[in-house]
Amino acid sequence: GDLSQRHRLVLGEIREHLRQLEARLDRLDAYLRDAMVPYAFAWTLLQTIPGIGEIAAALILIEIGDDLSHFGSAERFASWAALCPGNHESAGKRKSGKTRKGNSMVRYLLCEAANGAIRTASVFREKYRGLVVRRGHKKAIVAIAHKLIRTIWFLFTRRQAYHDSGIDYAAANVKKNAPRWIKALRTHGFVVKLAAAH
């Protein structure tokens, strides 16, 4: 039936609130991009890694910077990020100790990225599948986060983007940027009609 005046008022308020939120997100997005200009290369490198998007890459950069040379090695970098398990061997058996103390924010960000990475067609997903049965989800995620931080180390030291043969980079780029492209086209007066993929 027809909406009452009160219902129309509430819906109008909701629409206005959503419009304000969208405008705020646009401003934050622009601010983020401006802030990342001096670190554009490192920011872009991070986003080539499965599970790491624009926001996560920016937050990671805030914590680690774009020069990792002072860490000296991937192992020290991982240890600093609390992602280097204290492992030792005894009588030919590998025993795992507790993860060392370190930068809890980087550890958190990379564990979140690991949760995203295992959902991509990548080596991270395959490694996770091999670990989760034996170690459980939480320990497997920490192991993936450890692999991610070592990947970051090698990308930054070699100045090369990440490449995984299991990923369709062209399709991933379209999926990632399509909403922004569509919005930009609509802003400039173009009519965008989405068709189902075949």
Short names for language-model regions:
Residues 1-198:
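A detector of single, family-specific signature residues
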